Amino acid sequence: MEKLVTIIQQFPLAARPYTAKDGTPMVFNSRGFLLTDGLDEFYAEMTGDTALACPDYDRTLLHRMQGCIKTRAYTDKNGTVRYENQVFITKLV
């Protein structure tokens, strides 16, 4: 997916430590964005090295966002299967 967006809010870098399957300590880096395309507002997340190298973007300009939408299924506390759409940013210029 590719969209022209305006950044409403850029959240700070979040680093979450975890242990890999082989026992190696790792860090998962992510940065969230609240974006609008002029009609809709949506939350998108940048992860990994892209999030680490992410500068502070000018919120007054239009930016070109490339990303993907993934659907995650989960079961709530009542046993109902629910779905959540997640937007991941692969490139933001």
Name each model-derived stretch:
Residues M1-V93:
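Single-stranded nucleic acid-binding surfaces, predominantly the OB-fold ssDNA-binding core
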